[in-house]
């Protein structure tokens, strides 16, 4: 009894709040209660088939009142759907019944697959709203109930949201991996290891003298905590590939005036998105266009030409251009080949000057591609000479000859772009899943700081060292939304047969 009371006291005072309390803190709302919710789950507007979802204890009642009987579980049944009061026929469609807990939300649930006309959808929703105990669902409430029921952790919830909003193949693949729990399993594995470490330290504090727990237990904890810290730091050092893929790669087209930057934007977007003119300084503001290049999301920006000018409006455009260069993940530096010096020995100096304006404003993580435009106006011999000059430039970025007019070199540029985007974002199907949310990064950094506290106090005050493990566990738990003090006690009872 002494053991149990000590464990309960310690876990109550110092360990993380229970999962239910954590959920309430995260969402600032309580449990679903006895409400049954309904909503249109498919998109708004006219469509061939619309899906209306119902979840909660009155789901069976809703199906019976609208279709007269409950279909077999998880079987699509063709039914007449009528208003429960007027008995007016609303539609004929498929009805599916999912008894809890084997449903998406963990509750009794149902789906009405009906024709997608606005009048049909409105009629079915009004019929459901006329039933006692049913109310329209709030935004994201079905998924929130799935989280409450333990069907999804927070990383899987975020993966589902990302999948819904995915616009490219790479985004879809990353979201699917996260929704399938690949990222959550990494955090859960670290959480399990940290629970074990904390359980061992707490057992050593309370029972080492009475139960003769060996000192070697703490040495094992030291090694495990150090390895956990290393794994977390490696996970953080991903150059933000997952976050970049999720939000889009910022690509800026930069260079001097009249180099062909706007022509390049129009070529890549395959439409006249930017005004093209032989007059220098035509582009004075940033023009941003979303693109899908090889399955990767790109936010492509055309900018004002970089030059000194007395025009106040153009000066502001140049300032914004330089700001975009500083913020970009990838810079496409455009050079007009017809402006190169005639003497080969001056070419490296000319190119170095153009690149300097961009490179000196770029971060170390930023990638660059040098685009040599107007290649159709330069002979093959001149191109070879320019290629030789590029090789003489130390640290020169990858280069590509291109003609925005004839489209020569476009395939080579797209291949180079795709490979660079793959470097920036990674391949979602290869290797460990990467961080996708800023909050993941924040909580992991806090967890690492807490583990460092364990190392600092380990030989000074073991209780303070244990507090570091608790804080680290709390931070990890906030990523997935799952942490419970009872799980610490389970590990203690399993690993230490104290009191037999």
UniProtKB/Swiss-Prot annotation:
Binding site for K(+): 258
Cofactor dependency: K(+)
GO MF: GTP binding; GTPase activity; tRNA 5-taurinomethyluridine synthase activity
CC cofactor note: Forms a homodimer in the presence of potassium.
Hydrolase in keyword set: yes
InterPro entries, alphabetized: G_TrmE, GTP-bd, GTP-bd_TrmE_N, GTPase_MnmE, MnmE_dom2, MnmE_helical, P-loop_NTPase, Small_GTP-bd
Main localization (coarse): mitochondrion
Residues involved in Mg(2+) binding: 262, 283
Presequence range in chain numbering: 1-73
Positions bound to 5,10-methylenetetrahydrofolate: 53, 111, 151, 500
Keyword Magnesium among UniProt keywords: yes
Protein location: Mitochondrion
Binding site for GTP: 255-262, 281-285, 302-305, 373-376
Alphabetically ordered keywords of this record: GTP-binding, Hydrolase, Magnesium, Metal-binding, Mitochondrion, Nucleotide-binding, Potassium, Transit peptide, tRNA processing
Any one of the GO BP annotations: mitochondrial tryptophanyl-tRNA aminoacylation
Enzyme type, top EC level: hydrolase
TrmE-type G domain location: 248-422
Catalytic function, reaction form: GTP + H2O = GDP + phosphate + H(+)
The protein's Enzyme Commission number: 3.6.1.-
Function per UniProt: GTPase component of the GTPBP3-MTO1 complex that catalyzes the 5-taurinomethyluridine (taum(5)U) modification at the 34th wobble position (U34) of mitochondrial tRNAs (mt-tRNAs), which plays a role in mt-tRNA decoding and mitochondrial translation. Taum(5)U formation on mammalian mt-tRNA requires the presence of both GTPBP3-mediated GTPase activity and MTO1 catalytic activity.
HAMAP family with a match to the protein in the record: GTPase_MnmE
Similarity comment text for this entry: Belongs to the TRAFAC class TrmE-Era-EngA-EngB-Septin-like GTPase superfamily. TrmE GTPase family.
Protein name in UniProt: 5-taurinomethyluridine-[tRNA] synthase subunit GTPB3, mitochondrial
Source organism per UniProt: Danio rerio
């Amino acid at each position: 009894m002494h053991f149990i009371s000590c464990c309960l006291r310690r876990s109550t005072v110092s360990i993380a709040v229970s999962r239910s309390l954590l959920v309430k803190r995260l969402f600032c709302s309580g449990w679903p209660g006895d409400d049954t919710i309904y909503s249109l789950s498919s998109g708004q507007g006219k469509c061939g088939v619309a899906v209306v979802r119902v979840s909660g204890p009155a789901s069976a009642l809703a199906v019976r009142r609208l279709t007269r009987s409950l279909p077999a579980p998880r079987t699509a049944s063709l039914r007449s759907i009528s208003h429960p009061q007027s008995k007016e026929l609303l539609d004929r469609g498929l009805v599916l019944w999912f008894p809890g807990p084997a449903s998406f939300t963990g509750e009794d649930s149902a789906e009405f697959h009906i024709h997608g006309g606005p009048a049909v959808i409105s009629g079915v929703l009004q019929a459901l709203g006329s039933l006692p105990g049913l109310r329209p669902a709030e935004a994201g409430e079905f998924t929130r109930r799935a989280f409450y029921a333990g069907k999804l952790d927070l990383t899987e919830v975020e993966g589902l949201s990302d999948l819904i909003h995915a616009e490219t193949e790479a985004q879809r693949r990353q979201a699917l991996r996260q929704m399938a729990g690949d990222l959550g399993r990494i955090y859960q594995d670290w959480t399990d290891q940290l629970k074990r470490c904390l359980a061992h330290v707490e057992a050593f504090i309370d029972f080492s003298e009475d139960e003769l727990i060996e000192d070697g237990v703490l040495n094992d904890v030291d090694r495990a905590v150090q390895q956990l810290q290393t794994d977390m730091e490696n996970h953080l050092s991903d150059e933000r590939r997952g976050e970049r893929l999720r939000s889009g790669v910022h690509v800026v087209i930069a260079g001097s005036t009249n180099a062909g930057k706007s022509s390049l934007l129009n070529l890549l977007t395959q439409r006249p998105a930017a005004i093209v003119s032989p007059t220098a300084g035509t582009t004075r503001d940033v023009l941003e266009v979303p693109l899908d290049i090889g399955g990767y999301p790109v936010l492509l920006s055309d900018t004002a030409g970089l030059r000194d000018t007395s025009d106040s409006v153009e000066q502001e455009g140049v300032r914004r251009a330089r700001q975009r260069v500083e913020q970009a993940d990838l810079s496409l530096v455009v050079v007009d080949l017809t402006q190169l010096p005639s003497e080969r020995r001056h070419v490296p100096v000319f190119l170095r000057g153009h690149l300097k304006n961009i490179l000196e404003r770029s971060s170390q993580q930023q990638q660059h591609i040098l685009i040599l435009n107007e290649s159709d106006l330069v002979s093959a011999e001149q191109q070879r000479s320019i290629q030789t000059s590029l090789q003489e430039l130390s640290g020169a970025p990858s280069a590509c000859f291109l003609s925005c007019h004839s489209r020569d070199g476009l395939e080579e540029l797209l291949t180079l772009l795709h490979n660079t985007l793959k470097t920036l974002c990674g391949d979602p199907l290869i290797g460990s899943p990467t961080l996708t949310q800023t909050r993941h990064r924040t909580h992991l950094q806090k967890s690492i700081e807490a583990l460092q506290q364990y190392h600092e106090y380990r030989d000074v005050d073991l209780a303070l060292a244990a507090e570091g493990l608790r804080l680290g566990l709390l931070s990890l738990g906030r990523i997935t939304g799952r942490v419970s003090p009872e799980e610490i006690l389970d590990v203690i009872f399993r690993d230490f047969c104290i009191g037999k």
